[in-house]
């Protein structure tokens, strides 16, 4: 009887140890919050050029909405692809001199890229939790 109790206690302790990291794992709502924060930065970042408010900002916001939508659908790898597309657009705009790069004037293009990297990492974590493998 004592061996069964000891085995059960050890098994329970081991199960709690293995399950503990899952309690601290990234959640969809946490990633949505990160996306909302990125969206807020895109709404206020200084964008120069004649298409800033008619094409550039709406395009970036549309990409962010796409990330959010695929996340809600549980398509984590599709969301990562959309984050990478967003980053490409931001890099193109930085290269063209369209995005603010002075942190004293508000969000910068580099800040958008860093936030997008954090979102992609969190999405990969969700993919691992869901499927056991990362997105590529």
Where are these regions (language model features)?
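Residues in flexible loops and secondary-structure boundaries
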Residues: 9-10, 15, 120
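C-terminal segment of classical bacterial N-terminal signal peptides
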Residues: 15-23
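Intrinsically disordered, low-complexity Ser/Thr/Pro-rich tracts
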Residues: 7, 23-25
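Bacterial N-terminal signal peptides that target proteins for export
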Residues: 1-11
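Soluble extracellular-acting proteins and domains
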Residues: 25-136
């Amino acid at each position: 009887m004592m061996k069964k109790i000891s085995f059960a206690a050890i098994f329970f302790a081991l199960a709690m140890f293995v399950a503990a990291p899952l309690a601290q794992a990234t959640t969809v709502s946490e990633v949505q919050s990160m996306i909302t924060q990125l969206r807020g930065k895109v709404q206020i970042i200084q964008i120069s050029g004649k298409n800033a408010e008619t094409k550039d900002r709406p395009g970036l916001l549309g990409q962010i909405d796409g990330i959010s939508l695929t996340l809600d659908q549980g398509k984590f790898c599709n969301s990562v692809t959309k984050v990478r597309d967003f980053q490409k657009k931001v890099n193109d705009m930085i290269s063209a001199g369209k995005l603010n790069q002075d942190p004293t004037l508000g969000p910068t293009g580099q800040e958008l890229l860093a936030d997008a990297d954090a979102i992609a990492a969190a999405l990969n974590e969700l993919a691992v939790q869901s499927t056991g493998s990362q997105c590529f």
